[in-house]
Amino acid sequence: MGRSTAYRPALTLDRPGLYDWDADDAAAAEADPSAWHVEPKLDGMWGQLICDGATGEVWSQHGRYKATLDLPRPAGGRSVLHGEWLAGSHWAHRAGLDQTLHLFDVTVLDGVDVSGRTVEERRRLLVEAVAALGLDTHPQVHIVPRWSGAESAELWRTLVIEQGYEGLVYKRAGGRWGEGWARRKRVHTLDYVCVGINEGGGKHAGQGARSIQAGLYQPDGTLEHIGNVSGLTTELRRDMYARPDHYIGRVFEARGRGVYQRGTLRHPAFVRWRKDKPAKECVKPA
């Protein structure tokens, strides 16, 4: 049974800010393995499992209700467990993980705030809480695995490159909730043909382009509009709106966090124009 959208739980803590890392940062963590824990970053949304009584409710970071899970064993007091909720993404469907919750932390346990305890102690408490609630055998609940920083490069290769995980999360050993957290995400780039523009709305209506209509050549030789790419500078927005014909037909590069089967990028953003590449070479990726 769904919750009324007017209802909001008393969520415990805001989602921590994560530093964005690159390959050099990850290599530094691997060189000092005892200082870091590494966890996989799944293609889901931040979720909080709020357990009270015989049920646990999954809520997003913005206070939106997502699901209710029956607890095999009732909670002794209010507990808040944190994880990623996978629902509706291509990756979740392919992996057979749609509508599942992947837990990685706990901040409230039986009514007691444990956010100030070390990352290692909270991990132990999380495992114990999942077992105590009977969620260790629940088909929708999983605990995110964790490794030392020494495994960073191998995890990037096997999980991110080969299995399509979104990236890796790094947590400093001995840290409290959100202290010294970082992430490294995989970035994909693709080249498209500009087949049109989308006008800005609101205060930008009549003043600039909101996004570029991206096209790819199909096997039958037709150029098909397959998605839209944002991330334009103010100057480019205005110029594309003023003289769209100057841009239509040109090749551009975009980046995103993943590639869908159709050839569209996840969270696409404009990178640059490609004067060196013919439009006919912009084809749907294999």
Describe the predicted segments one by one.
Residues W91, L109, G149-A153, A279:
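A short acidic, often aromatic-flanked loop/helix-cap motif at beta-alpha or helix-coil junctions
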Residues K280-A286:
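Intrinsically disordered terminal and processing segments
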Residues R3-G63, L69, D136-D276:
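Nucleic-acid 5′ end/cap handling module spanning
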Residues A29-L135:
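Covalent nucleotidyltransferase
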